[in-house]
């Protein structure tokens, strides 16, 4: 069964610039496999789960990845352009209020 999960990855050529990868998958490593088929090898900087609310234009990130550990949010540098205009929040636990993430320096790809 698929679940809404995300990972943060970086290309070895730009190791300090992370990309937000998300989708409905069974395991976080399924996101990595699909992304690497197109973009080549990537270093993973953790991951978690997400709750996307299109009506409120929010993307709440929470939890951690069983495959890759807690998300290192300093690597949230590049986000798919279909999410531009969304407010991103992070909370360690589902159902808890989230903190708004600063996205002023994000590149929308």
Feature-to-residue mapping (PLM):
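Intrinsic low-complexity, intrinsically disordered or marginally ordered coil/linker segments
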Residues: 1-109
